[in-house]
Every structure is written in C-alpha cells, then in structure tokens.
Amino acid sequence: MEAIKNKMQAMKLEKDNAIDRAEIAEQKARDANLRAEKSEEEVRALQKKIQQIENELDQVQEQLSAANTKLEEKEKALQTAEGDVAALNRRIQLIEEDLERSEERLKIATAKLEEASQSADESERMRKMLEHRSITDEERMEGLENQLKEARMMAEDADRKYDEVARKLAMVEADLERAEERAETGESKIVELEEELRVVGNNLKSLEVSEEKAQQREEAHEQQIRIMTTKLKEAEARAEFAERSVQKLQKEVGRLEDELVHEKEKYKSISDELDQTFAELTGY
C-alpha cells in the first residue's frame, strides 16, 4: 500500500512536471508564433519597400530616357547650327572674293582714267601753245599754217579722244558707282552675316550650356540609379535574411508544437495510468 502511495505521488509529481513542461512549451510556441508574425510583418514591409524602390527606379529610368532623348535633340540642333555656320562662312568667303575682284577692277579703271587725263592735259597744252604762238616770219608762215592745221587736226583728234575718254570716264564712273553700290551692298550683307553669325554663336553657347546641364542631369540620374540599385540590393538582402529567420522560427514552432504534442500524449498516458491505479485501489 505504501508502495502504491509512493508510486501515485511520483506519478502525480511527474504529471505536475509534465503540465509545467506543457505550459512552458505552449508559452514558447506562443512566443515563437509572435516572433514569426513579427518577422512576417517585417517581410511584408520590406517587400512593400522593395516594390516602392522598384517603382522609383522605373521613374528614374524613364526620366533618364527622357533626358537622353532631349540630349539627342540638342545634339541634332547643334549639328544643324554648325552646318548653318559653315554655310555662312562659305557665303562670307564668296562675298570677300567678289569684293576683292571689284576692288581690283576699280584700281584698273582708276589707272586708265589717270592715263586718259594726262593725255588730255598734254593735248590741251600743245593746242594752247600753238594757238598763242605769234610768228612774224612770213617764210615760216606757210609751214606754221601747215603745222597749225596739223595741230588743229591733232587738237580735233585730241578733242575726239577727249570726248571718247570722257565717255569712257563716264562709263568708268558709272561702273565705279555700281561697284561702290555692290561694295556697300556687300558690306551690308557682311554686317548682316556677322550679326547672323553672332546670333548663331550665342545659340551655340546656349546649346553648349544646355548640353552641360543635360550632362549634369544625366550624371545625377545615373548617381540616383546607382543609389536606388544599392538600396534595392540591401532591401533584397534584408528580405532574404528575414525569410531565413522566418523559416528558422517556423521550424522552431514546429519543433515546439511536436514537443507539446509529445508532452500532451505523455500527460494523457500518466492520467490513464493514474485512473487505472485509482480503479485498482477502489477495487482492492
């Protein structure tokens, strides 16, 4: 009888210990479930953050694509402006060559005019000298008259040459006026072309400044993409670590649940054994 009581006490103590262990296992299981739920919330938060970072990365890539498109358009505009500058330079060169030829023709016409003026002056001097010469020698009168006739003929010829020279001079002056007008027109065109060239130069400077700003924006976008990529990798690494932690916690929860089931089965076995013992004692 004493042995049975001792056995019952031992079984009761073992039962109490089993209940304590079961409660501890249940508490551990609850704690593990809480940790698992917290880890799952962290995983969901990380996944949401990853999605947000991916969206931001898409936006940055779209902005970069738009910046590249604008940069290509500006490069095309720069090439067009450079072509316009080259065309203007060719036009300026042609105008300068035309101006040089006009100046050369003007020099030639001026030289011819000076020669004609000198010839006319010489003829006029000879005519005046012959007209005002007074010769009293009758023997030389006939010769002088012949000379006078010749001089008159020469004077008339000189007059004709003078008229021709005057006519040519008028033509040369007209050509000179036209050349001066062309030169003035050329100078006006040169001024206009220089103004156009200055405007194109300013446009080129503006395009260069815009290109530098576009390059700076592109570098900033690339830097932002690198930062976003780094953040994405870090978030993915944290997500993987959290998933591994969740898996470990789930394994721990499974192990604790198995231990709890084992303790419950053990408790049930002890309870059945106690019931059987009480039944035996009662029958006894």
Swiss-Prot record:
What's the family? Belongs to the tropomyosin family.
Summarize the protein's role. Tropomyosin, in association with the troponin complex, plays a central role in the calcium dependent regulation of muscle contraction.
Q: Which residues form a coiled coil?
A: 1-284
The domain comment in this protein's record states: The molecule is in a coiled coil structure that is formed by 2 polypeptide chains. The sequence exhibits a prominent seven-residues periodicity.
Listed Pfam families: Tropomyosin
Q: Which keywords belong to this entry?
A: Allergen, Coiled coil, Repeat
Query: What protein am I looking at?
Result: Tropomyosin
According to the UniProt record, which cysteines are disulfide-bonded? none
Assembly and partners?
Homodimer.
